[in-house]
UniProtKB/Swiss-Prot annotation:
This is Copine-B. The gene is cpnB-1. Belongs to the copine family. Its cofactor is Ca(2+). GO terms for cellular component: cytosol; nucleus; plasma membrane. SUPFAM superfamilies: C2 domain (Calcium/lipid-binding domain, CaLB) (SSF49562), vWA-like (SSF53300). Residues 1-125, 130-253 form the C2 domain. One of its GO terms (biological process) is cellular response to calcium ion. Keywords: Calcium, Metal-binding, Repeat. It comes from Dictyostelium discoideum.
Length: 530
């Protein structure tokens, strides 16, 4: 029997260091990051592959965020590595300005992989002049499907400030080309006994699935000005910690040990209070762990809907002739409502007259919240006939309100996720402001936005908000959404099949929730380490 050959493309992880970078800032040091572009095709179009994090005030940065790229043996993959000092989001080489660039290095992926230890060290240049050195290390990723979840604390760490320290730690995986940074913790201020939040890493990022691969944990004291102070380090591997062979590790500072000779014991002790392998958390893991789902409904009250009292109005609504708004509320709300933890749904209006003037975000009805889908439909039927419609169709205020409210009380130990259902009949009048609010919400708010288009409009702007075309949503200042949080569906495409409407509008919610949780390193509460 012939063994089937896997046709999946290998994936390669690229990690980076730089040194001796030219300083582009006047009053401080540059804030470098590395952007990677893949030059493809006969016309040489440069495709954005990924970028590292930005490291502030550092001319010798060591980046913890890697860039992942598919490896095509059969193709020449010309890669450009551009070191920049920049604040705005960039996705195209053409968007870079000359004064943003510290330096650039171009090579092929094949050249990096074929080098001894899969490592390249080269000068970077800008306008023909050397402006620093870049070090690129490559490693093929072996997908494991597991995560390494651990929690550590420290005791009696060395004082590096007057009375205390501000400790943080770095994890390096060893390789034939040297140690490679794979994780850096947050700084805990003013303590010699730090207690860190749980950390979850993909096993392939930590050790590429090799449970005996040596890991180096370095502890440092953070200084806001000047160089950070080294506290000490220890080495171990995942197998040792998982099996509980050793859970306590003394931090050793070799220079301090040499000075103090026989009197030196350690520079503190690090304890793994728990450690385990877990699968990638699922949407159900978060729900069963206690993550609350909250539903908000926003109803378009603009004049383009037509007077609710006329039969041609999109808001014309009777028990025997429910409007498209009512049908959408019932269809989508019936699926979402069972997940709403307390059964209360907030109903908002926008584009109508509220308290004497046009409002783009107001309480729809006499109650701030109503019970279930039935309550939403009852409120809609009571309020819409007497609603004074206005204009224009603005989304900014509604999205801003929902984004802020979704953050109320949300922590890793109190997880909530909000779904904002917007029902609208027309094109957005405040497109730039709306895009800005969505981009901002994608970075910080536990929020998904479901938009249902009512009526016969073309909804071109709505399709732009929905990132399903593969292009990340970018606002006028160049900031790009870190996750896709918008799903748009025209009601008329599914008017004959309400179940299909709900399926289409809600199918991306699980991945959007997972995106927020991963972005913030929130574990399912049932997975949390004590």
């Amino acid at each position: 029997m012939t063994t089937p050959i896997s046709l999946s493309k290998p994936r390669v992880e690229l990690r980076f260091k730089c040194s001796h970078l030219k300083n582009l800032d006047i009053c401080s040091k540059s804030d470098p990051l590395i952007m990677v572009f893949d030059k493809r095709g006969e016309h040489g179009e440069s495709i954005f592959v990924g970028q590292t994090e930005k490291i502030n005030n550092n001319l010798n940065p060591e980046f913890k965020k890697s860039v992942i790229i598919d490896y095509h043996f059969e193709n020449i993959q010309n890669l450009s590595f551009i070191v920049v000092d920049i604040d705005k989001e960039i996705k195209r080489v053409g968007d870079l300005e000359g004064n943003d660039i510290i330096g650039q290095y171009t090579t092929t992926l094949g050249n990096i992989i074929s080098k001894p230890n899969k490592k390249v060290i080269s000068e970077i240049k800008h306008k023909g002049k050397e402006t620093g050195v870049i070090e690129i290390t490559a490693e093929e990723i072996r997908e494991t499907g597991h995560n390494f979840l651990f929690k550590i604390n420290g005791t009696k760490l060395d004082k590096k400030d007057l009375f205390t320290s501000d400790p943080y730690f770095k994890i390096y995986k060893t390789s034939s080309s040297g140690n490679v940074l794979v994780y850096q913790s947050v700084v805990i201020k003013n303590t010699l006994n730090p207690n860190y939040e749980p950390v979850m890493m993909k096993l392939e990022e930590l050790n590429n699935g090799d449970m005996f691969r040596e890991l180096v944990f370095e502890f440092w004291d953070h200084d806001s000005v000047g160089e950070h102070d080294f506290i000490g380090l220890f080495t171990t591997n995942a197998d040792t910690v998982l099996k509980g062979i050793t859970r306590e590790f003394p931090l050793i500072n070799a220079k301090k040990a040499a000075k103090k000779s026989g009197s030196y014991k350690n520079s503190g002790v690090i304890t793994f209070t728990d450690c385990r392998l877990v699968g990638q958390p699922t949407f159900i893991d978060y729900l069963s762990g206690g993550c609350e789902i909250n539903l908000m409904v926003a109803i378009d009250c603009t004049a383009s809907n037509g007077s609710p009292s006329t039969s041609t109005s999109l808001h014309y609504h009777t028990p025997s002739h429910p409007s498209q708004y009512a049908k959408s509320i019932f269809s989508v709300g019936s699926v979402l409502a069972p997940y709403d933890s307390d059964g209360n749904i907030e109903v908002l209006g926008f584009g109508g007259i509220h308290r004497g003037s046009t409002s783009h975000c107001f309480q729809f009805g006499s109650k701030k919240e109503v019970r279930g889908v039935e309550g939403v439909l009852l409120t809609y039927g009571e309020v819409i006939p007497s609603m004074s419609l206005s204009y224009p169709t603005n989304f900014k205020d509604i999205i801003s309100y929902a984004a802020k409210k979704s953050l109320d009380g949300v922590t890793s130990k109190s997880q909530k996720y909000t779904i904002l259902l917007i029902l609208t009949d027309g094109e957005i009048s405040d497109m730039n402001e709306t895009v800005h609010e969505i981009v901002k919400a994608s970075k910080q708010s536990p929020l998904s936005i479901v938009i249902i288009g009512i009526g016969e409009a073309t909804f071109d702007n709505m399709n732009r908000l929905d990132g399903d075309d593969g292009n990340s949503l970018t606002d006028s200042s160049g900031q790009t959404a870190t996750r896709d949080i918008v799903q748009f569906v025209p009601f008329n495409n599914f008017s004959a099949n309400p179940e299909a409407l709900a399926t289409e509008t809600l199918r991306e919610i699980p991945q959007q929730l997972l995106g927020f949780m991963n972005q913030n390193n929130y574990l399912p509460m049932s997975h949390r380490l004590k």
